[in-house]
Amino acid sequence: IIDQPNLMIKIPATKAGLPAITEVIAAGISVNVTLIFALTRYAEVIDAYQAGIEKCANPKSVHSVASFFVSRVDSAVDKLLNDDSLKGKAAIANARLAYELYLEKFKNFPHNHQRPLWASTGVKDPAYRSTMYVDSLIAPNTVNTMPPSTLDAVIAAVIEAEDTITPNIQSAKDELLALAALGIDLNKITDELEADGVDKFMTSWDVLLDAVEAEIQKAK
């Protein structure tokens, strides 16, 4: 048993995962809720976390992050666009509105906040600025996990730690409306991204189990 206070277990933000989040948080176990793409699902994740921590015997000991996947949204949306001016906009706009939802839902919440975590923040399109998903998503109480190459780019860029989300929430709404006007169904896209993410997780889990079983057999 690792038994470290900063350890979190991962639970995917699927419909089936929501009650598990509540139950595990209520049991006093810290959780990284992962594979979040849609704002509607993020709202359900927050509700699941808050329901769990309200039942927890020692809520001060429990922490959680909600991992909102960023660059995959742009990868899916951009290939549907002919309008270059809207390429590279969907993911950041989506994340900024997620932060607005975080502020609303936790405004008067008395226990530890479930912090938004920006995941998948390495750019997939080489035409984009390498720090785009970092310097565009800075705000209090957020976390950003990034690959080493992106971290190196951030260090080299000497990015100022100023809020780049809340001043741009209205523009984020405008960008998503513009995408919807072009027929981009973001809900459909995020549903597909979630399903694909779960498939990848299951494949990784099966590979891990096979590797563990192989080592057990070797040790016999």
Language-model-detected regions and their locations in the chain:
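Short secondary-structure boundary/hinge segments and terminal tails
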Residues: 19, 41-43, 197, 211
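Flexible, acidic glycine-rich loops studded with aromatic residues
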Residues: 112-217
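Catalytic cores of alpha/beta
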Residues: 18-25, 44, 130
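Short catalytic-loop micro-motif centered on adjacent basic/acidic residues
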Residues: 7-11, 31-35, 188
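Glycine-enriched alpha-helix->loop->beta-strand junction motifs that scaffold or abut catalytic
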Residues: 3, 20-31, 61
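Catalytic alpha/beta core domains of metabolic enzymes, predominantly
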Residues: 30-149
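Active-site beta->alpha loop and helix N-cap motifs at the rims of alpha/beta catalytic domains
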Residues: 1-20
